[in-house]
Amino acid sequence: MTARRNNSVEQARQAAIEVLLHNLHGPYHGLPRTAGWGYPEPYTRDLLIAGLGALACGHPKLTESLRRVLETLARNQTHHGHIPSLVHDREDRGASDTTPLFLLLLAMYRRVAGEPDFLESPAVRALTWMDYQAPSDHVMVAQLPTSDWRD
């Protein structure tokens, strides 16, 4: 890679980190906001996808923020393991991708943090919920019209 491209990549990386840091404190229970200049709500899908960037850059404030998001999701998880669509609202359910995203980011966070048992009980409940989302028992989770994306 040329020096010019290297510089462009580094500038993009720094800009992304600045956005993530800007979004650290939103108006809902000290959780990050979804979009710094748009949606203040802590949408699970968006924050977990942003969590990939938080873990990749290794910034301690971003890693700690992801931990808070995961802990809040675990507290707001349904008895059967479904993860809500809004991090802070246990009644906002219906998304089919929030629970698998929770499991993915939880596994990655555990590895980065060196905490293999972090949120073990919520992880087991989430896996149980996932099992019941595969009607044919062939591991593949169903995407039914009633559990479709709402945006």
Model-derived features with residue positions:
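Aromatic-rich carbohydrate-recognition surfaces in CAZymes
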Residues: E41-L47, A54-L144
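A short, charged helix-loop
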Residues: T146-D151
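Low-complexity, Ser/Thr/Pro/Gly-enriched N-terminal "stalk/linker" regions
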Residues: M1-P42, S65-R68
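Short alpha-helical segments and helix-capping/turn motifs at coil-helix boundaries
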Residues: A35-G36, I49-L52
